[in-house]
């Protein structure tokens, strides 16, 4: 095994004369990239022009913030809608047999959306408070509640298909009054 010689940079790592012989270009002398407008390209700008530019920029930023808030509100509103196909598929694949996993899944499909509906304001808290976007955020909140309702409906249908929802007359027999059709007459005696 032969010993390798160290790299060139390793030999001259601490040699200051070696570093000085390389011409290092200052980044201030490099040209700006295309489309970049720095302070040097503006030249002589009056105070009024700077104020007008800053007002235009602040108005554009406010408009951009408004647009971003509406987009964020719709992202929040569409989160439950994205889980609807998966929940339908899981509900279908788990079958209608009475087992703990499908029952818990169906109950979670009922309880999760109820909790989410009651915490709608906290879910939309980052985008609330701007009067310019209030109507659009309220529309997104309404759709959020609708999508949560769809998830609850999937859970209800799952529980109904398992027979856990009492919806037939036979499910309520213990609370029915007993009807006597013979008016106290006994037909058979011992």
Curated annotation (Swiss-Prot):
Pfam families: EMC4
UniProt-annotated stretches for the region Disordered: 25-57
Keyword Nucleotide-binding: no
Record membrane topology: Multi-pass membrane protein
Subcellular location: Endoplasmic reticulum membrane
Bias type Polar residues, positions: 38-57
Membrane-spanning ranges: 98-118, 136-156
Alphabetic keyword roster: Endoplasmic reticulum, Membrane, Transmembrane, Transmembrane helix
Summary of subunit composition and partner proteins: Component of the ER membrane protein complex (EMC), which is composed of EMC1, EMC2, EMC3, EMC4, EMC5 and EMC6.
Family in the record: Belongs to the EMC4 family.
Function noted in UniProt: Part of the endoplasmic reticulum membrane protein complex (EMC) that enables the energy-independent insertion into endoplasmic reticulum membranes of newly synthesized membrane proteins. Preferentially accommodates proteins with transmembrane domains that are weakly hydrophobic or contain destabilizing features such as charged and aromatic residues. Involved in the cotranslational insertion of multi-pass membrane proteins in which stop-transfer membrane-anchor sequences become ER membrane spanning helices.
The name this protein goes by in its record: ER membrane protein complex subunit 4
Organism: Saccharomyces cerevisiae (strain ATCC 204508 / S288c)
Name of the gene this protein is made from: EMC4
């Amino acid at each position: 095994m032969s010993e390798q010689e160290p790299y060139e940079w390793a030999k001259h790592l601490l040699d200051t004369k070696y570093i000085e012989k390389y011409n290092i270009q200052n980044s201030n002398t490099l040209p700006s990239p295309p489309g970049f407008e720095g302070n040097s390209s503006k030249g002589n700008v009056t105070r009024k022009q700077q104020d007008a530019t800053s007002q235009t920029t602040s108005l554009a930023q406010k408009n951009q913030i408004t647009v971003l808030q509406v987009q964020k509100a719709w992202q929040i509103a569409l989160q439950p809608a994205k889980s609807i196909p998966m929940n339908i598929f899981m509900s279908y694949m788990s079958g209608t047999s009475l087992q703990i996993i499908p029952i818990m899944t169906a109950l979670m499909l009922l309880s999760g959306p109820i909790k989410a509906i009651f915490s709608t304001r906290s879910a939309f808290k980052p985008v609330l408070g701007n009067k310019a976007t209030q109507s659009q955020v309220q529309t997104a909140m309404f759709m959020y509640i609708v999508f949560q309702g769809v998830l609850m409906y999937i859970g209800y249908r799952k529980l109904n298909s398992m027979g856990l929802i009492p919806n037939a007359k036979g499910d309520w027999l213990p609370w029915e009054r007993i009807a006597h059709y013979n008016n106290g007459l006994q037909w058979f005696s011992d």
